[in-house]
Amino acid sequence: MKNSLAEKLKRVLSNEIAIEYKACLYALCIMVFYCICLLCRGVYSADIFFLLQMFCTAYVIVYIQYYLLGNPDEAERLGLSRMLGILCCVLLYTVMSYFWNWFDRNLFVTALFLVYMISIYLCVFLINKIKRVIDTNRLNHLLTEFKKGEVHE
């Protein structure tokens, strides 16, 4: 019983760390876009309430992405269902940006934001894929060393 509880706790903690990482990453990307838009308009201060909305929105969407959409940005490959998951998340961000009036409901800027978020999701997908290849190669190297009896860590 103790092991099963400990394993469940580890799994939950691991999931929460992944969610935290992604929510912060996507929130930061949204804030960068928002701040660039402000700078282009000659505004040199950001609305803190908007920044809070961006963080909360990122957390909610990442939870949806993680638990309901199969975590599409960490897939091995981008099939139709994963692409639809990414598109769903991007559309949620775009709708929320319009709803919360982050970009003054400017349709051109909102469309740019949609394209920007698609590119962010694709970059995160590629980065995760590259990291998996690196991790796999490292584990294979460690396994080879272990089999030879040459482990040096």
Specify the residue positions occupied by each region the protein language model found.
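Juxtamembrane membrane-interface segments at transmembrane alpha-helix termini
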Residues: 62-67, 122-129, 148-152
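Alpha-helical transmembrane segments of integral membrane proteins
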Residues: 17, 21-29, 49-53, 80-88, ...
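C-terminal halves and exits of single transmembrane alpha-helices
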Residues: 84-113, 117-130
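Short, highly charged, low-complexity non-transmembrane loops/tails of multi-pass membrane proteins
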Residues: 135-153
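The feature represents the first ordered module of a protein
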Residues: 38-101
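N-terminal signal-anchor transmembrane alpha-helix
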Residues: 1-41
